[in-house]
Amino acid sequence: MSNIVGIEYNRVTNTTSTDFPGFSKDAENEWNVEKFKKDFEVNISSLDAREANFDLINIDTSIANAFRRIMISEVPSVAAEYVYFFNNTSVIQDEVLAHRIGLVPLKVDPDMLTWVDSNLPDDEKFTDENTIVLSLNVKCTRNPDAPKGSTDPKELYNNAHVYARDLKFEPQGRQSTTFADCPVVPADPDILLAKLRPGQEISLKAHCILGIGGDHAKFSPVSTASYRLLPQINILQPIKGESARRFQKCFPPGVIGIDEGSDEAYVKDARKDTVSREVLRYEEFADKVKLGRVRNHFIFNVESAGAMTPEEIFFKSVRILKNKAEYLKNCPITQ
C-alpha cells in the first residue's frame, strides 16, 4: 500500500499504517533492525543556538510523536520553584511575581544538578547539589539628573523597570567552583518582571530545582516542538501559460516554479507548501494535480527556551526513550 497520505478537496485518504506483520499475505512486514538502520535518515536543514529544523525519514509515527512528547514534557530543566519574599511594596502581588520568576528560562545545564528527594525532611531536602539560589534586590529612587520636562520613567527614576537580568546568582557551598565557568543567568535577560515607582522595592530569594514539563510548563525546555509530514505535489498534466501563473498563485511563494523556456509549471520546493488545498477549489486544476503527504517523512521544528541547544534537547529525548524501552524490556512483569 502507498506510503502517501492522500489530500483531497473534502477529505484525507490512506491515513492508516498497514506495514505491520499479518496485514497482507503477500508481504511479511516484519520489523528488522538492520533494515531500519539502512533506511533511516536524519537530514538537518537549519541549526542554531535556539532553533533547529531537521527531517526524520523512514520512521514510524509512534516514534516521531514519542520524541515530540518527550521533548515537551519529559526532558528536565531548571526553574524557580520556591520564592521567599522579604519585602515587596510594588503593585504586583507576591504570588504573581513568583509565578513570573518561575517562568523565566535559566541558562543552566540540568545535568549539573541532582533531583530533590521529596521523602527527606525540609531541613535536609535542599542542598548545593540540587538547588540554585537566585536573589532579587531592587529599589526605585528618583533620578536627580533627570532632564527637565521629561515624562519617561526610565529617565525620571532609577530602577523603574525590573528585568530578569536583575536576578543574581548566589553560589551555595561548592557551587562557586562547579559553576565557575558557567554562572547561572536568565536565558532572556530582557524579560520584564515588574515596574516600580520611587519608594517601592522588591527583596526576595528564589530556589530553583530540576523538574519536567509534565509537572509544570515552566520546566519545559522548549518553546515549541512540532513536526509535519513532507508535502507531495504531483502535476499529472502539463500546465502552461496563464494557467501556470494561476496555478502558481495557489501555493505559498517558492513552491511552484515556471520554466522560462516552455512556460510550464513545475514543483520547485514542495517542502514549503502548507497544504492549504487552495488549488483544489478550481475545476481547471481538478484533474491536473494530486496532493499528498509522505507518511514516514517527518519535518521537525524545535525551538529551545534557552537553557539548552535544540540538539541537546533532542539527544536527551532519544536517551529517555531508550531508557523507557530498556525498562520495559527488563521489567519483571514482562518476564
UniProtKB/Swiss-Prot annotation:
Top-level taxon: Eukaryota
Entry's Gene Ontology BP terms: nucleolar large rRNA transcription by RNA polymerase I; ribosome biogenesis; termination of RNA polymerase I transcription; termination of RNA polymerase III transcription; transcription by RNA polymerase I; transcription by RNA polymerase III; transcription elongation by RNA polymerase I; transcription initiation at RNA polymerase I promoter
GO cellular component, one term: RNA polymerase I complex
Coiled-coil regions listed: none
Other remarks on this protein: Present with 13000 molecules/cell in log phase SD medium.
Matches recorded under HAMAP family: RNApol_arch_Rpo3
PANTHER family assigned: DNA-DIRECTED RNA POLYMERASE, DNA-DIRECTED RNA POLYMERASES I AND III SUBUNIT RPAC1
Name of the protein in its database record: DNA-directed RNA polymerases I and III subunit RPAC1
Organism, as annotated: Saccharomyces cerevisiae (strain ATCC 204508 / S288c) (Baker's yeast)
